[in-house]
């Protein structure tokens, strides 16, 4: 059993799914030949030992079940069965002492040099990759090719970049293949403290109402494991009516697909059927886009399913594609977002890093609530000083910045605000975050950003964050979101 798993995995990287090769370090799948052979030999020897341990455990458990008392000794057979089952489970849990389990030999993961550097050092080596160099629709069609009709598709969305990671063509192709789509709203742990799961769920339903019929929506956190019980429940229900035992996990680059699968696998390990049957390794995850290069299949016996992780679909509308890989990681929150509330009038302009400029051109006093990474600075300055601040401070006080010369374009936003207590609309910049607008009366904003970066106006996700006690009254200051202090220029 274990040996067959090793043989299946020996040709492919267990972290990113690419095929191993020993020739060119600049191409995906490179692993030194001696390292590959030594690890493979170690795993083959270890598998024999693990099989013997597993066989002995099964014999002990079977012998214990044979000692179960006769039903005739009990007046009520229902209570007899319940007591016996509980006793067997307790005995099976303690069948292997912890110190013996810890002394078991361990199988070593076989991963490529790229995955090794990502997981050990947090570095992203630049290697040639076929699928990520293709247009998004071409990549999407290639990912969907092996998916059978009426399969289950888990579509993972980055909730912090909902519009940037939502690819409508996924729903179109899924309808053609009559797939059952479950929309996974990942990274709820990055939302502010007062975010309510029920409100997020209903918001997700409303935003996708016109894209797909009978869509299941599940808000989850791959980091904390919150929300996974609903996903497992849906998968169990669908498994009985689905001809294909494979569940395909799709999503845009950096939406958290691999992290989602790793957490799902851990949750399934807690089920009795999955005990001592963990996969050989976890999928490689990182803060860099495009970590997974080829499809990877993981078996979950407790669900009687196989989970297939697919390469991230490139969405060229995200602002991160116009930044260096190092600066792109600054836009990915690694802790809860703390909303920044600023007052807006036509006299002032706002910079989000050196990436986006927002100016109010008409209307009365409004609140702007910024939902962006804590590593991205927000600067409020007078309108006549905005360009000078950019020329002097891009990449310094205003961070991050674009990694190339770009063509700027303007987007006009007209909003009729209807409440001082609740945001009316969100201004969304793909790959960056969003800004909620709160107040009374009509107003117009002009948003300056890089050409081809995605932009949306939507219903507010977090509409109640513009509270008076959160307002930062600043003039000519920068909010350094990394430390949440007001720092003078």
What label would you give each PLM region?
Residues 179-182, 190-255, 261-274, 278-281, ...:
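Canonical P-loop GTPase G-domain recognition
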Residues 187, 201, 367-370:
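RNA pseudouridine synthases
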Residues 156, 184, 307:
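Generic enzyme active-site microenvironment
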Residues 136-139, 167-169, 196-204:
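Well-ordered, non-membrane alpha-helical segments in soluble/globular domains
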Residues 166-178:
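Histidine-anchored nucleotide/phosphate-binding helix
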Residues 3-152, 180, 276-489:
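Helix-rich effector regions associated with P-loop NTPase G domains
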Residues 120-123, 148-167, 188-196, 225, ...:
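Conserved Switch II/interswitch segment of TRAFAC-class P-loop GTPases
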Residues 158, 242, 300-302:
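Loop/turn segments within WD40 beta-propeller blades
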